[in-house]
Amino acid sequence: IGLFMLGSVATGAAILVAATIYGIGKTFFWPTMLAVVSERFPKGGALTLGAVGGIGMLSAGLLGGPGIGYKQDYFTTEVVRQENPAIYQEYVSDNEQGFLFFSKTEGMDGAKVGVLLAKDPSELTPTQARERAALQDASIRGGQTALRWTALVPLTLAVSYLILLFYFRAQGGYRALELEEEAKGTAS
């Protein structure tokens, strides 16, 4: 909910509320995941916890960052293409970029856009000022749309946790698995 809200709000107070909701949700995700793993697979110990945490962090770094960047480029370019075709033609990149199995997209040329954004607003011609405003607006809207689409990932995880909840209720409730006792009655 918080991530979706971050992609939908524009005022400072609303951003603070959305970030707080996102932070609360994020606070419960990692501990819940690690608690379930440690209680359901106690023999795995620290190695299992480390592997699960490592896979999560690798996924976030190798898939999350580039995936969000791809979506931001895609949606930003679509906004410019639909609303300002002339600006699109001037600032579109010659290189198409893809991500995993998603279609390739032409992002905006970062070098050209960077030169425009680096100029002092008082030095801009009226055309450049209009282009700058359009590109900044498209970038913000593209980033917000990318965040809203990214919210599907934690939504999928939330649904998965609900499925686990129903599964454990059907089994008579959630119980941590105990390590088997050794012959002398001590836990291994």
Short names for language-model regions:
Residues 44-76:
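A late C-terminal transmembrane helix in Major Facilitator Superfamily
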